[in-house]
């Protein structure tokens, strides 16, 4: 194998640039030519591909986002789009591909693998919702961003003696809400995987006030329902005044933490090593801090479950 391509797809996450840097430098170190594919699978179809040098990835390890840009491609879901992308790679003599993204990106990667192109997936999403890996690139940074926001909001919640509902990302997976709820000392955490009882949420708030609490923080994952609806429900049912903050896309941006830089660097280098070793149709997962290749089919056959121990712990510590 002499030429490898790399792309980022789907939602961006802090640490992707560290991964790209590792792919390029590890590849060049091993005597390979590395090609960057811009704008994800859309760029693959449109031929937005160029050779990357060591200098192409200088001064990016500390930057959020992705220098290769990203997108979601409906065209690549079609056989014609997949063939077009495959042909563009073959025309340039690219013999392997590294795809950085989430499960949707890996489904696109698997299609190319089935067409005969060696492909390795690297998990990158702030949702940390990919099965068969304990951590995905960007989750730690997003978690710290949410914690910083909680700390700041708690200051004003204390000053005004008020309830704040904070909506965080997590359409189908509540890991970001769950972990930030525990680390941020939230009074209640609502996630998509566990049905909530508003009466119990209100009871917990009132119990806190009886003990002398002057403010409360409720973390809600966007997949439960909009934070504004939760706030309205609390007001209508219990007459408790509250404010709602939607953190939105601020959770995706910003300087990656040391952890995400390390994780991205390790995963990127490992992806190159696997391609050179003849591996394909796999994602690199992490278990007990060790990197483990996992077949795409095993990733797709499972649903990421929340850590119920963390949920129980969060509940018990927020009394």
UniProtKB/Swiss-Prot annotation:
| EC number(s) recorded for this UniProt protein | 2.7.1.11
The UniProt keywords, alphabetically, are: Allosteric enzyme, ATP-binding, Cytoplasm, Glycolysis, Kinase, Magnesium, Metal-binding, Nucleotide-binding, Transferase
Q: Which cofactor does it need?
A: Mg(2+)
Q: Name one Pfam family in it.
A: PFK
Residues noted as binding Mg(2+) in the record, renumbered to the chain: 103
Drop me one GO molecular function for this one. identical protein binding
Cellular component, GO annotation: 6-phosphofructokinase complex
Query: Would you identify the family this protein belongs to, as annotated?
Result: Belongs to the phosphofructokinase type A (PFKA) family. ATP-dependent PFK group I subfamily. Prokaryotic clade 'B1' sub-subfamily.
Subunit structure, interactors included: Homotetramer.
What's the stated role of this polypeptide? Catalyzes the phosphorylation of D-fructose 6-phosphate to fructose 1,6-bisphosphate by ATP, the first committing step of glycolysis.
This chain belongs to which protein, by name? ATP-dependent 6-phosphofructokinase
